[in-house]
Structures are given as structure tokens and as C-alpha cells.
Regions:
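Long lumenal/extracellular ectodomains of secretory and single-pass membrane proteins
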Residues: 1-311, 321-488
Length: 488
């Protein structure tokens, strides 16, 4: 009886009435499936989800936390990492102290400032001082230094919280404000951070040497103050004669920039920067016979930073354009009804202008997507191998209730309907970009399905190949060599 009560208690519904599960059956997997989609959530909710995972398996939860922050191999989520790190410092300080040296390695040095005014503050400041002293020694010897100087807080900042932190850091380093400021100036000059050049109106720097985030952030400043050199750089980048760094720019940032500036008088300049940056994004496309399915329903416009619909559209375009399989340059957009869209246009902006004419802001009928593919296959007697091998569903997971057998989840219903017609349902990747509620589309051992979350296209390469279950996939990611050093 207890087993059946647990099963019944684990059933819930989406905002649109579809059957769903409260949990996958693993709190760590629940977090793994949503941790990249929590930017719009409160700190209280983020911490609650992590505490459940940490209680279930502390080591795995810590690996998951660093995977979420990992800017090179993971999701690159800053807010959720710092929120959880602050909670850990107050409640599980030993776990933080054990992993202190990995914080900047997987993220940035300023992530450590989340430990200010916690039981881990002393150890954090000692760690920063050691790195600072090593950098100052290398600076005196003419060697290279770390990026610590870039991310340390400035005592002359306009934000009072930053000033407070900077003064604490300076005193921990045994310095007064003036000496600390002078040291930071020297370190930043050695690092050649672009902000120094912009502040001094020094446009002699090499665009090819600038980090991706800075290039994207200051693009309009380059147009205003260094038009000729910047335009020449973009032209060279477009022909492959110059390297434009875009490895840490997310596709949604380009989509949102387009949506925010397309009516501006300076859009012709913005357009050139967007096109060049999009072309320079790293390629995680692959060669699978896979098809992206993006949600543009009304709920995908709830929330900001980023707008979930912008994330979904950017990833759909990115994958369709870069995937070399049989569905190249196509994706399905769904709301009330699915639309199979062929991408048209030469440049990123051309394609985006075209795609925005298809948006249908209504409800979230995922069942109709599965039915579209099945109808086309049955009607034309298409062999199984010509169907998409994988459907990558990018959504907030708030699906409509099924028309038939509404007590079953959308996934269970689709599996049944395909089997009745003599087909196997393609593998499904449920990719969450806005987790507003604690509900999951499948449980942990469901075969042929994977649960992921986030805004980075790196996930496309992670989910390539393999008929996995959600839990197996999570373990493959978190037990990889990259996260081996991390433990509670």
C-alpha cells in the first residue's frame, strides 16, 4: 500500500493540465534537470532544491553544483552557484573549504566573494591573499599573472557593497586603500583588460586578443570610437582572416540583442556585430538525424534575463543551422499547433527576421508535435530509420493535457501511440529553459529519454548518441574525469 501511496503522491499536473511527476525519483536528478533553468527563481527556492539533492547524495550534489557553474565544460550558471555556495558556507562549511581552490577554476575569482560574511570568509581571504602575492611576485619578475586582478573588487567603485568587500580584501592583504588600488592598477595593466583601454580612450589594442564577453559587451563603443579598425576586424573575421572570440557568448544573448535594438537608428552597426559574432560561435552541432522542437507558447515569455522564448529560439536556430543530419536547416516550432520551419536567409539577422514571422504565442501542445511526425510516417509508409532519431524539446515543460488518456503523461501517450502504429518513438531530450514549478515529464529510469537544462549550446554535444535513461545520463556527466576532484 505504501508503494502505491507514494506513486499517487508523486503525480501532479503542469500549468496547462498535463499529467507530470513531482519528482523523477531522485532529488539529484530533479536538480540536474532544472539547475540551468533557475535564473528566475528566488534564492529560497534554489536553496530548497539543492538541500534536497545534498541530503540525498552530498558528493553528487557538489559535483552537480560545479557542473552548473563550469564555464568551459558545463552550464556556466553564475547566480545559482553563488546562491548555493553562500548557503553551503553557512551550513556545510567543510564542503566549501574542501573545494575552495576549484571555485575560480570552474568559474571566476569573484565567485569567492559570495563567502564574505560567512564562516568561510577567513579561509577565502587567505586563499585570495596567496594568489595575490604569487601574482605580485610574477609581476615583479615580468611573468604572466592570473585573472585575479581583473575580478577583485575596487575600493573606488560606485556600488557600496563592492567598496565594502574591497576594503575587507585590502585589509586581509595587509594594505591600505591606496596601496591596494595601486596594486590592482598594475595587475590589470599586465592583464590588458579592455576596460582600461576604453577608460583611457586607447584604441591600440588587438581585437583578436579580446575575450568574448568584452567584445560583445562593448561592441557599440567600438563602433562609436574606433569605427574604422573595428569594421575592418569584423570584415576579416567574416572571411576567416581574423579570430573573433565568441566562446563564452550564449546564442540567446544575440537574439535578445537583436530584439532590443532592431528599431534603433544604430541597428546597421549592431547587425554587423551580431552577424560576425553568431558566425564565430563554437560548433556543437554534430551529425545526428536529430530535430529541435522549440516552445513559443505564452508562458515562454514569462520572466526576463533571459526570456525563455529567446533562449529556445536561439538554440533551435543554432542547432538547425549547425547540425549536419537529415533535418539540417529545419526545426519545429510549437504552441497551439506545430510548424515545421525551414530556415531561410544568408546571415544571422536575415534568418532571425524570417523566423520571428512564425511565432504563435498560444498554449503548449506537445502532443500535436508527436502526432505530426507519426501522421507523416504512417501516411507515407516511411521506414523507422527515416524518422528523426532524436527530438530535442526546448521548453518550460508546461505542456497541455493530452486529448486522449489525459491521466497519462505526454511522453507515455506518445510512446503508446507510436507502438500502436508499428513505430518506436524517437529518443527524446527534454531541455528545460525555465523551471517555474517542481514537476518532471518522466521518471529516472525511463529509457530513450534525457533530462537537461540551461542556455548553453554545449548541451547539444553532451546529448549526442546513446540510448540512455535520465539517471544514467546524469551520472555519465557528473562522474566524468572533469568533476572527479569535487566532493562534499
Amino acid at each position: 500500500m505504501l508503494k502505491y501511496m507514494k506513486q499517487e503522491a508523486n503525480m501532479t499536473t503542469t500549468e496547462n493540465g498535463a499529467a507530470a511527476y513531482v519528482s523523477t525519483g531522485s532529488k539529484c536528478l530533479d536538480l540536474f534537470a532544472t539547475i540551468g533553468a533557475l535564473r528566475g527563481q528566488s534564492e529560497k527556492e534554489i536553496i530548497a532544491r539543492f538541500v534536497q539533492a545534498y541530503t540525498e547524495d552530498a558528493d553528487l550534489a557538489m559535483k552537480l553544483l560545479f557542473f552548473a557553474r563550469d564555464i568551459r565544460g558545463g552550464l556556466g550558471e553564475r547566480k545559482v552557484f553563488r546562491t548555493i555556495l553562500g548557503w553551503l558556507a553557512k551550513n556545510e562549511p567543510a564542503s566549501v573549504q574542501k573545494n575552495l581552490a576549484y571555485v575560480a577554476e570552474y568559474g571566476r575569482f569573484d565567485d569567492l566573494l559570495a563567502l564574505m560574511d560567512t564562516p568561510c570568509e577567513k579561509e577565502m581571504l587567505i586563499y585570495l591573499r596567496k594568489q595575490f602575492e604569487a601574482d605580485m611576485k610574477k609581476l615583479a619578475e615580468g611573468g604572466s599573472v592570473s585573472l585575479l586582478g581583473k575580478w577583485l573588487p575596487s575600493v573606488n567603485a560606485s556600488n557600496q557593497e563592492t567598496v565594502y568587500q574591497a576594503k575587507k580584501v585590502a585589509r586581509a592583504f595587509g594594505m591600505n586603500d591606496a596601496a591596494y588600488r595601486k596594486a590592482l592598477t598594475a595587475l590589470r595593466a599586465k592583464i590588458h583588460i579592455i576596460e582600461n583601454h576604453l577608460r583611457e580612450k586607447d584604441y591600440t589594442f588587438d581585437y583578436e586578443q579580446q575575450p568574448s564577453k568584452a567584445l560583445f559587451k562593448y561592441k557599440m563603443a567600438f563602433w562609436r570610437n574606433d569605427r574604422e579598425r573595428y569594421q575592418a576586424f569584423l570584415s576579416k573575421a567574416s572571411t576567416g582572416d581574423a579570430k573573433l572570440h565568441a566562446d563564452h557568448v550564449s546564442p540567446y544573448e544575440l537574439v535578445e540583442s537583436y530584439l532590443n535594438t532592431r528599431w534603433n537608428s544604430t541597428f546597421s552597426e549592431e547587425k554587423a556585430s551580431l552577424n560576425a559574432t553568431w558566425a564565430a560561435l563554437p560548433d556543437f552541432g554534430g551529425e545526428e538525424n536529430a530535430l529541435a522542437v522549440i516552445d513559443t507558447s505564452g508562458s515562454m515569455y514569462c520572466g526576463r534575463n533571459p526570456i525563455p522564448a529567446a533562449v529556445a529560439l536561439s538554440l533551435g536556430l543554432y542547432f538547425a543551422e549547425r547540425n549536419k543530419g537529415g533535418f539540417r536547416n529545419h526545426f519545429i516550432e510549437f504552441s497551439e499547433r506545430p510548424q515545421l520551419i525551414e530556415i531561410k536567409g544568408e546571415t544571422f539577422v536575415d534568418k532571425l527576421q524570417y523566423l520571428t514571422t512564425f511565432e504563435e504565442i498560444a498554449d503548449t501542445n506537445l502532443e500535436a508535435v508527436f502526432d505530426l511526425i507519426l501522421r507523416a510516417a504512417v501516411k507515407n509508409q516511411v521506414p523507422q530509420e527515416e524518422l528523426p532519431a532524436k527530438l530535442i524539446i526546448i521548453s518550460d515543460m508546461e505542456f497541455n493535457a493530452c486529448v486522449n488518456k489525459a491521466s497519462k503523461t505526454v511522453f507515455k501517450n506518445a510512446k503508446r501511440r507510436y507502438k500502436e502504429k508499428g513505430y518506436s518513438l524517437p529518443e527524446v531530450v527534454f531541455w528545460n529553459v525555465a523551471s517555474r514549478n517542481r514537476q518532471q515529464p518522466v521518471t529516472k529510469n525511463e529509457q530513450g529519454v534525457v533530462l537537461v537544462s540551461g542556455a548553453t549550446p554545449r548541451i547539444f554535444s553532451m546529448v549526442a548518441g546513446g540510448n540512455l535513461s535520465p539517471y544514467t545520463f546524469m551520472m555519465e556527466v557528473l562522474q566524468s574525469e572533469r568533476y572527479a576532484p569535487i566532493a562534499a
